Amino acid sequence: MAQAQYTGTGRRKNAVARVRLVPGTGKITVNKKDVEEYIPHADLRLVINQPFAVTSTQGSYDVFVNVNGGGYGGQSGAIRHGIARALLQVDPDFRDSLKRAGLLTRDARMVERKKPGLKKARKASQFSKR
């Protein structure tokens, strides 16, 4: 029989992560690279592992992620969101703890667009009275 496989899609800023959970040893692979190689910042790797910490399932699943768009921070948030959604398929009873930790909510904050006549979204050139 084929091994159980759970999927979830996570999004954050401009990053989209498609996550596959397979029962295993806890190895995380992002875009066919090891997570330590793909994401150099240790604090962002902690962000990725938050759903496992909340549900006490560390080391229970191998994670295969396909992520594109955004930078390291956005991609880490997208992976976290995808893992949380995939864990819901594993056990619907996880919903309460994941929701309380805020891991199922899509972070809606996006970069504000640049406005014409300004240097950036809100930065204007210095005002001169005379």
Swiss-Prot record:
Phosphoprotein among keywords: no
GO cellular component annotations of the record: cytosolic small ribosomal subunit
One GO molecular-function entry: RNA binding
InterPro entries in alphabetical order: Ribosomal_Su5_D2-typ_SF (IPR020568), Ribosomal_uS9 (IPR000754), Ribosomal_uS9_bac/plastid (IPR023035), Ribosomal_uS9_CS (IPR020574), Ribsml_uS5_D2-typ_fold_subgr (IPR014721)
Keyword terms, alphabetized: Ribonucleoprotein, Ribosomal protein
GO BP, one annotated term: translation
Pfam families assigned to the protein according to its UniProt record, in alphabetical order: Ribosomal_S9
UniProt-listed PANTHER family: RIBOSOMAL PROTEIN S9, SMALL RIBOSOMAL SUBUNIT PROTEIN US9M
HAMAP family on file: Ribosomal_uS9_B (MF_00532_B)
Protein family (similarity comment): Belongs to the universal ribosomal protein uS9 family.
Protein name listed in UniProt: Small ribosomal subunit protein uS9
Gene: rpsI
